[in-house]
Amino acid sequence: QPSNGVSNNTKDTLKIANKIGYPVLIRPSYVLGGRAMEIAYDDKALKFFAETAMQVSTNNTILIDQYLENATEIDVDLIRDRDGQVFVAGIMEHIEEAGIHSGDSACSLPPFSINAEVEDQIINWVTKISNKIDVIGLMNTQLALKDNQLYVLEVNPRASRTVPFVAKSIGLPIAKIAAKVMSGEKLTNLIPSLERKKLETFNVKESVFPFNKFDGVDLILGPEMKSTGEVMGIDKNFLSAYIKSQIASGNNLPIRGNVFLSIDDSNKNRLLPIAKKLKKLNFKLIATKGTRNFLQKNKLD
C-alpha cells in the first residue's frame, strides 16, 4: 500500500502529510463518488482541503495517502464462493493516470499495456485478499502500477460500477452468478471454467460528462467524480475501440482545428511528444504563457 495515515484534526493531518511527503491524497472517510477528495502539494492547500473534508466526514475522520504520480490505475472485479473458489472476471487498465476518479477514467478490458507477469501478480494478490477477508460474492480491488511496482489502493467487498461493463465484455451475467454464489451455489456449477479466457476484442469504457449542460463547471478531472454516465466501444484493435468509445460519448474526434494546451512544469516533458504529433497532423497549438514558452524553446510554435 502507499504510505498513509488517519487524522481527525488539521494539526495531525499536517504532521502525517509531512512525514509521508507531498503530494498527498486527502479524503473524508465513508463517502461515495470521491466527494471532497483532493490532491495537496503543500501545507497551504492541505489545510484548506482538510477543513473541507472534515465538514463532509460523518465523524471528522480524514484519510491521508501518498499520491502516486504518473502511475497506472487498475480495476479488478472477481467472484468468490463459500468453498474459496475464485473467478477473476475482469482486469481493467485505466487510460487516465491514477488519481482521476475511477468513475471518470476510461478503461480497457483486457489491459492494453500491462504485461502477463504483472497480470499474474494481480490475480495472485486479489485472490489472496478475497480469501483473507472471506468475501462471498463480488469484490472490487483498485490497484496502481508505478515503476513496475504494484500498490493496493482500495478493496470493496461488493459490486462495483464496473460490473455491467465487465459482464458485457466477457459475455457472462456476473451479477446473477454472484447472487447465486451468495445463496450458497458453487462457482464450478455456474461457470464453465474458472480460468480467464483470452478475449477476442478490446472493450473500452468511457465516461459521459454533463459539461455542455452546466456553465462554469471545472473541466479538469481529479479525485472527485464528475461523470453522469458511461458508454463502451468494442473492436479487435485497442485504438479503434477507444475511438468508438469517444464517438459514443459525444466526443467527435476532429481531424483539423485548434488544440489548447496547458500543463504544469513537472509534466511539460511528457507533453512534448504529444504536441509534436498534433503539429504533424496540422493542428494549430494554442497554449497558456508558460506552456507556450516551453513549446517555443523546443521549436514548436
Predicted regions and their residues:
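A conserved helix-loop-beta module that forms one wall/lid of the active-site cleft
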Residues: Q1-M37, N298-D301
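Short, ordered loop/turn segments at secondary-structure junctions
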Residues: N9, S29, A36, L143, ...
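Surface-exposed amphipathic alpha-helices with a cationic face
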Residues: N18, I274-K280, R292, Q296
